[in-house]
UniProtKB/Swiss-Prot annotation:
Domain P/Homo B: 489-625
Compartment list: Cell projection, Axon; Cytoplasmic vesicle, Secretory vesicle lumen; Secreted
Enzyme category, top tier: hydrolase
Active site: 174 (charge relay system), 215 (charge relay system), 390 (charge relay system)
Name of the protein described by the UniProt record: Neuroendocrine convertase 2
Signal peptide extent: 1-22
SUPFAM superfamilies: Galactose-binding domain-like (SSF49785), Protease propeptides/inhibitors (SSF54897), Subtilisin-like (SSF52743)
Organism: Caenorhabditis elegans
Function: Serine endoprotease which cleaves preproteins at paired basic amino acids. Processes FMRFamide-like (flp) and neuropeptide-like protein (nlp) neuropeptides. Probably by processing flp-1 and flp-18, modulates the neuronal excitation-inhibition balance and thus the level of activity of the locomotor circuit. Regulates sensitivity to mechanosensory stimuli. By processing neuropeptides, modulates basal acetylcholine release at the ventral cord neuromuscular junctions. Probably by processing flp neuropeptides, regulates the turning step of male mating behavior.
GO cellular component terms attached to this protein's record: axon; cytoplasmic vesicle; extracellular space; membrane; neuron projection; synapse
Domain Peptidase S8: 136-481
Gene Ontology terms describing biological process: arg-arg specific dibasic protein processing; determination of adult lifespan; dibasic protein processing; insulin processing; larval feeding behavior; negative regulation of dauer entry; negative regulation of dense core granule transport; negative regulation of turning behavior involved in mating
Keywords noted in UniProt: Cell projection, Cleavage on pair of basic residues, Cytoplasmic vesicle, Disulfide bond, Glycoprotein, Hydrolase, Protease, Secreted, Serine protease, Signal, Ubl conjugation, Zymogen
Amino acid sequence: MKNTHVDLICVFLSIFIGIGEAVDVYTNHFHVHLKEGGGLEDAHRIAKRHGFINRGQVAASDNEYHFVQPALVHARTRRSAGHHAKLHNDDEVLHVEQLKGYTRTKRGYRPLEQRLESQFDFSAVMSPSDPLYGYQWYLKNTGQAGGKARLDLNVERAWAMGFTGKNITTAIMDDGVDYMHPDIKNNFNAEASYDFSSNDPFPYPRYTDDWFNSHGTRCAGEIVAARDNGVCGVGVAYDGKVAGIRMLDQPYMTDLIEANSMGHEPSKIHIYSASWGPTDDGKTVDGPRNATMRAIVRGVNEGRNGLGSIFVWASGDGGEDDDCNCDGYAASMWTISINSAINNGENAHYDESCSSTLASTFSNGGRNPETGVATTDLYGRCTRSHSGTSAAAPEAAGVFALALEANPSLTWRDLQHLTVLTSSRNSLFDGRCRDFPSLGINDNHRDSHGNCSHFEWQMNGVGLEYNHLFGFGVLDAAEMVMLAMAWKTSPPRYHCTAGLIDTPHEIPADGNLILEINTDGCAGSQFEVRYLEHVQAVVSFNSTRRGDTTLYLISPMGTRTMILSRRPKDDDSKDGFTNWPFMTTHTWGENPTGKWRLVARFQGPGAHAGTLKKFELMLHGTREAPYNLIEPIVGQTNKKLDTVQKAHKRSH
């Protein structure tokens, strides 16, 4: 079913897109908006008249087009006033914009060295015979290479139930896919593929001496590498299809390249996997621009014939000095943000943490070369060293392909609900010592004991465990497909503006600034929310050092979420945050009625001063209890589902 009110959120989310490069870079790409009635042939004619090339219609638009001026260099520091004027003065053109370029980086850590379960007898399940399968510990962890046995994606049980990704296409938005690789070629969906870097239908990677453009091919193999063919390893959804969308391999990214990539063939592509984002340097704050945001919103509204496109995002490789809530892609409600763990359950040293991460999969384990991700590589070769959250996102996309095969009617929201309910704490833990201040706040947060603080596992108001690093835990393919088979479509989703404080408040140099909003969840209105999915705190502030400003959100049920952690490398004192939607999933399933508290404080050495200018609380969820009609398959229980169902009945 089509979800209501989604487009309303695009209005305020588009406010924050102006944050970009330190120095403006102008490309030879132009966004051209024709007057009403302007069609494709008109666009071709206008482009030719002024010496441009029309690359086609912009995704999620009716009369907007992507022009390229071949006479201009790819990037320059000044606008081209002459070329802009030609289009601007054309009587058939409503608006024209020369596009700025910006940076998007691949999220791959480079190593220092270069149906019913009772129907199956799982003890007799045959493992794949592919030569690298024994190294794919994240698919079947027997304790190899010092890992923890059974800490894996539990895919063999899902395969045994007959789910292998059949009829599901996942698009790899990256630097290209080697679709002639012997482990990929039979699972390549050419009709759903395109090269937006070169503007042709062949998304083949550009070879370089340093193998830099191997990223997309490696991600593709994680999902669809063929089984039992004697080549490399096996993909999570080895009977699925992969589409290549080449869009990273050019000097600068533009809004239209991103938008067209995310809006490409939404009726043929089920899942879009992205292992890239803004620079993971601990000081960048960036997110989708206007056209890209519109493409994502249209995707979740209209993709897959109204069920919604699935966007999977790598949470980021900035490590403990970064926060993925400063990445507008990973922190979006419309994407599923995936973090990683290594083979013993510990977080990887490059893992970022944030409250928008929904779940985790796996990536390379520590410094042991035997614990990388085994997958396909360029030149028809294999690799055992794929890594970073780049490797984690495709694993999740593969699991989601299995779930969509089990139940093709799942909406984009259904898949997020399934992720919350079937992900597992398993053996995941935070292996780093962290410096957490004592807030002195009365809530349900569980602090670490001893001299070393960690991101501990917490429990929200309806009994769901979550972790600031791992979200709701590691994906479990078998649990997900079993619950997917029994799933009932989620009730309609609504968006409640719960309150606004726009009077400036000074953040004290020591201690907390606490702002409170009391809400009834828009009770009695058409926007009433009684059962939460996503919560956003839309915040504006400036401070003497942006990276030393931390924010916490506490729900009426006592769940504490750190929506902005300290980023010691971020020394900004000018831009701050303007209408930035800090998102949390940690209050999933809770009743939002009551007092919400936003806590702002400084953390770090030196003198601090700052002003919090705005706090707006946005609640997203359902009026009806989302799980009331779901009954697990006979003989199969889901403890998390049972826990939340009981909590909802008690509060009804």
